Amino acid sequence: MNKVIFIINDGVYPYHTGGMEVFNYHLIKSLSAEMPICYIASQEYDFDSAKYVRVAPLKPIKIFTPLWMFLYLMFHPEFKRVVLSFSAAHWLVWRIYELAIRTLRLKATIVIHYGKTVPPDHFSIYSKFFRSAENIVAVSEDIKNNYDAAYGINCKVVYPLIPFTKADKDSSYYRVKYHVPIDSNVIAMVGSLKGMKNPQRIIEALCLFDKEELVKYKPHVVYAGAGPMMEELKFLVESKGLSEYVSFLGLIPNPQIREIMAMADAYLIASDFEGTSVSLLEAMYNSKAVVASNVPGLRDMISNGENGLLYEVDSPEQLKECIIELLKSKPDADRLGRAARYSYDLRYDYKDVLNAYKDLLR
């Protein structure tokens, strides 16, 4: 069987907690139990069966890593297959990878996680990079359609699933653990607190609730994540007098996200765009009522009124309406949650993901 090398820099959980990083962690851990895997990174991970190749953490690490990969593989010809995760980075990074792939005649699998097409200014560089690959994987149908049309390629869609599990205690237990009001209606947001995720939108929506509505519906927002907008959000919450309606839990280890799902009545994802959101998948797995922004990558997973609710991404007014619709009728919210789980079971299976990658990397 071919030896496979994953190029991950430091971009894997637990050092980074985005969906791509969590997915790569579980993928390498699972595949290395069945096939010879090596990974190039600046830090070692708990991959029991995978070989670690250390790259010095020199900056800019995204540019230094492909150079290190080239030098390492020059002297280790037994590795002919490489796996790269494509996301937002300087065009020079992908140019270096493309030259290394062609020079060393590597069989590359490129996994596209980035939800938007790349800037048109460097079209030829990205086109050559993608065409140097033996396989190109897109993590959503929307990404496939965008990149196929832009670059004349044919991506294979493989969803970024991880092996989800459910929490073993009830909602009340975790609300006590995380100091969340027992009798509130919890709306959970999971992930990085940064601009394209629009974590402020739910605060803007809460500002539209009058006193009677806050008492009646008892909304309580739980942020499970950290990021550059954390302090800005805390200031906004305090300045609007909403501190009793919002909890900031900070960075939550991935295995504990199931606890957040267990105590949530609803899950909110407010992004400008997504590939296939790992946290949304986990919410669907946990039968949560979902509210999502009506954007590419999310409307492919959520059908308004069927397995969740959609709102226009820049409209806190619509978001408020969606929240009230969920909170005013528990039977309707439960129905949407069951439909979300049904959609998950119909479309997603971690074993299918592993088998797809094993087929690609044979």
Identify what each model region corresponds to.
Residues 251-252, 259-264:
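Short alpha-helical donor nucleotide-sugar binding micro-motif in glycosyltransferases
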Residues 304-305, 309-316, 325-331:
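Conserved acidic donor-binding segment of nucleotide-sugar-dependent glycosyltransferases
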Residues 289-292:
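Short hydrophobic beta-strand element within catalytic cores of glycosyltransferases
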Residues 181-197, 203-206, 222:
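Conserved donor-binding/catalytic core segment of Leloir-type glycosyltransferases
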Residues 142, 161:
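Carbohydrate-associated surface elements
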Residues 245, 318, 325, 332-347, ...:
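A short, well-ordered alpha-helix in the C-terminal region of glycosyltransferases
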Residues 272:
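Aromatic "clamp/platform" in nucleotide-sugar-dependent glycosyltransferases that forms part
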